[in-house]
Regions:
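Conserved catalytic-core motifs characterized by acidic clusters
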Residues: 1, 30-34, 174
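Helix-hairpin-helix/helix-loop-helix acidic hairpins
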Residues: 26-40
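C-terminal interaction appendages of subunits in large macromolecular complexes
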Residues: 4-7, 11, 15-19, 24-27, ...
């Protein structure tokens, strides 16, 4: 069985999506076989920001459940930076409250928020946002709780049911005016109706208000753990530091390998004619590399590299251009080794 052609499965990603996969080709995370062992897939993504707190995550598995509210990306990143600088930083000072992509408003209670941040458990209420159009005597609802499974159509049906049941008498009409500019449910009011009191009634009787129950249950090293926000961010920081360490090792090895090749090329520069003579006078192809090794005191890897150079490139100009990178590579290697030796540099 093969996967579908890319035209059926491809998706256009926003630029920030690149941060999910950044440096994935530099051994930053482990790869395992996919379901049929035909290719490799990452066990985790080397995401450059704490995505677990930026996306609204809810799910149920065997014997466990998870419900993680989303937060503002800028606030999450700022909080993470402050925690790196100061492990005793108060999370609530920079991470004000949950922030849902669909909008709506939260009845803010700092004590409740801090309890959720500390334990990873708790709940809060979300309310639809509205404005009152006095000239047309109507309420425009522009944001609904993202936690609700209700759509604008089902909300309208619920309101109509309440009107028919006699629970709501202040509404003369309700309609869906949602368009490309965004969601909009318009409620026409009867004369003399207080819009704020009506909305309080709608919050009680319809899905225009909802609760979000937090259960920050995540898998850490394959085991489920309920964690507070600070603990979660510290766990992500440790993960990201490991990604940086692995990326640095990858870059360091690549730089050292390249420097090693250029060191061999540098020796050839001392006597290009000798290199050409060795190649020309060698009777069998298999003997070219050993003869270069003997002639210039280089190892097999360096000799293989030199032997693969085209004849037209065996000139002083070409070799000088290549060996000019040696000084930059030495500086890069020193910088990378400093990063590996210093946790502070890795965090930066």
């Amino acid at each position: 069985m093969m996967w579908a052609a890319s035209r059926y499965t491809e998706a256009k990603l926003d630029p920030i999506s690149a941060e999910l996969f950044k440096d994935i080709d530099k051994d930053t995370v482990d790869f395992v076989d996919n379901y049929d062992s035909t290719m490799k897939e990452p066990t985790l993504l080397p995401v450059t920001f704490p995505s677990v707190l930026v996306n609204n995550n809810t799910g149920i598995a065997v014997g466990m459940a998870s419900s993680i509210c989303s937060f503002n990306l800028e606030e999450v990143c700022r909080t993470t930076i402050e925690l790196i600088r100061n492990p005793d930083h108060c999370v609530a000072d920079t991470l004000k409250a949950p922030d849902f992509a669909g909008g709506a408003k939260i009845l803010y209670d700092r004590a409740k928020i801090e309890e959720i941040y500390r334990t990873g458990r708790g709940s809060f209420k979300l309310y639809a946002k509205y404005t009152y159009d006095k000239s047309n005597n109507c309420i425009d609802i522009t944001e609904i709780p993202m936690t609700s499974t209700a759509t604008s159509e089902s909300i309208i049906e619920k309101v109509i049911d309440r009107v028919k049941a006699g629970a709501i008498r202040e509404i003369s009409d309700i309609r869906d005016e949602t368009d490309k500019s965004g969601l909009k449910i318009t409620i026409d009011l009867k004369r003399g109706t207080d819009p704020d009191k009506l909305m309080q009634k709608l919050y009680r009787l319809t899905p225009l208000s909802d609760s979000f129950a937090c259960n920050f249950n995540v898998l850490i090293a394959g085991s489920p753990r309920v964690m507070g926000v600070k603990e979660l961010l510290n766990e992500w920081i440790a993960f990201r530091m490991e990604c940086v360490r692995r990326r640095t090792y990858f870059d360091l090895k690549k730089a050292k390998d390249k420097l090693h090749l250029l060191r061999g090329l540098e020796k050839i520069l001392l006597d290009i004619d000798k290199a050409i003579k060795i190649v020309r006078n060698t009777e069998e192809e298999a003997e070219v590399v050993p003869n270069l090794m003997i002639g210039f005191g280089i190892d097999r890897i360096q000799a293989e590299y030199v032997a693969e150079i085209k004849l037209r490139h065996l000139n002083r100009e070409y070799i000088l251009k290549r060996t000019q990178d040696i000084e930059e590579l030495e500086k890069l290697i020193a910088d990378l080794e400093d990063i590996l030796a210093s946790a502070a540099e890795s965090a930066r």
